[in-house]
Structure formats: C-alpha cells, structure tokens
Regions:
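Hydrophobic alpha-helical segments that form the core
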Residues: 159-181, 191-205
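Short glycine/proline-centered loop/turn elements that form peptide/ligand docking sites
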Residues: 1-17, 32, 41-43, 51, ...
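Generic hydrophobic, amphipathic alpha-helix propensity
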Residues: 22-33, 47, 72-76, 80, ...
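Short secondary-structure transition hinges
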Residues: 109-145, 153-156, 164-165
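Helix-turn-helix
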Residues: 25, 33-71
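C-terminal peripheral helix-coil segments that are non-catalytic and often amphipathic
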Residues: 1-16, 146-150, 154, 183, ...
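Amphipathic, non-transmembrane alpha-helical scaffold segments
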Residues: 19, 69, 73, 77, ...
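Hydrophobic alpha-helical connector segments
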Residues: 71, 85-113, 167-170, 192
Length: 218
C-alpha cells in the first residue's frame, strides 16, 4: 500500500499538535498547582497524580522540574504579552486605558496568589526568576512605550514627555513590586492594591489636560 508524502506530512503535523496540546496541558495544570500550593510543596509525583499520567510520560515532555518551571514562566510571559499586544491594537488610547484597568481588576484574585509563588522562585529558583523578570521588563517596556506614543499622537498624553523613560519607569515599578512583595505586605497592603494605585498615579502623571479630563470621566 502506497502512502503519499502528503499523508505522512499531515500525520507528522497532527502528531506534533497532539504533543504540544499535552505539553500545554501539563504546564497549565502544574502552574495552577504552583499558584495554589507553592512550587516547593508540589512534586512531579503530585503533578502526575493530578493529571492521571505516569512519570515516564511526564519525562517525555520535561527532563526535570526545573525545565517545567522555566517553560511555565515562559508561558506566563507569552500570556501577558498576548494581552498587551491585544491592547496595543486598539487604536484608541482612551479605550486602551479603560481595558487595561478592566484587565487589572479582573485578575486581582490571581495577583493575590502571586506572593507564595514568588517566594519559592526567589529562594529555590533564583536563576529562573531573574530571567523571568528581565523578559517581563523588556516586554512591558516595549508595549507601554507603544501605548504612550499612541496617546501622544492622539493629544491625550503630554507631548513633552520622555516616552522611553516613562516606559522604563512603569516596567520597573511593576517588576520591583513583584520582587519585593514582602515590603508591601509589611505595610498592610497587597500587590493588587499597589498595581491599581501605581497605574492610576502613572496615568495621571503622563496625561495632557484633555487626557486627564477624559480619564476623570471613566
């Protein structure tokens, strides 16, 4: 029986897609467990039990727990990047800010679970955490710069603003807040409260008179 090259290619693509789906499922399940229980307290055995999967199958996709954590963090960056890219395609600065604030509010429950995850990453996986922070910083800086440039073009952000520096400032505030969450909690505040306040102060600081007038009507 002759099997065409096209059929073989389709089979290979299908098999690869199935493999990626399984890998994504493992990352998603493990990520949820890490957020809920902390990274240190969740073993590969726990993840496999939750998935109904053998350790042999797990190791087909990840050579170690460290490798899983690295890919989970990359998946998180991709998720945040997707959200920010979607906002950058709005074409309307006022709507962009509204949606940014809406996303922030919708994800407040997830933000409250971040401290345990960050604590474990800082203590037990410092290299992966440092790499994650660098990637997050660069990604956020790039998109925030796009947002601000859109606002300037539409007359809603101050034309004399140092756009590059403002984008760096926003990304640094966000990343430092996640890294130093213990200091925030010492003052009886949480990450969501800080993120909301920082966003409000930042936006008010960069807006033109017209932009501020519209922002106050939100």
């Amino acid at each position: 029986m002759h099997i065409s090259e096209k059929s073989c290619t389709f089979a290979a693509v299908f098999e690869n897609n199935m493999s990626e789906d399984q890998k994504t499922h493992i990352i998603k399940t493990a990520g949820e467990m890490f957020f809920r229980l902390g990274i240190r307290s969740v073993s590969i055995d726990d993840i496999c039990h939750e998935l109904g999967m053998s350790k042999k199958t797990f190791y087909v996709y990840f050579e170690s727990k460290d490798a899983l954590i690295e890919q989970m963090l990359q998946a998180n960056i991709d998720y945040i990047g997707g959200k920010m890219k979607s906002l950058s395609e709005q074409g309307d600065f006022r709507q962009l800010v509204k949606k940014f604030l809406k996303h922030q509010e919708a994800e407040k429950n997830d933000v409250r679970r971040v401290p345990q995850l960050v604590y474990d990453l800082k203590k037990y996986y410092p290299r992966q955490f440092a790499d994650f922070q660098v990637k997050c910083f660069e990604m956020q800086k790039g998109y925030i710069k796009q947002y601000i440039e859109l606002g300037v073009a539409q007359g809603l952000v101050r034309a004399n603003l140092n756009v590059e520096l403002a984008a760096v400032l926003f990304a640094k505030i966000h990343n430092d807040a996640i890294r130093d969450f213990e200091e925030i909690e010492m003052h009886n505040h949480n990450l969501h409260q800080l993120a909301h306040t920082a966003m409000d102060v930042f936006v008010r600081g960069i807006l033109s008179e017209e932009g501020l007038k519209l922002y106050n009507e939100k």
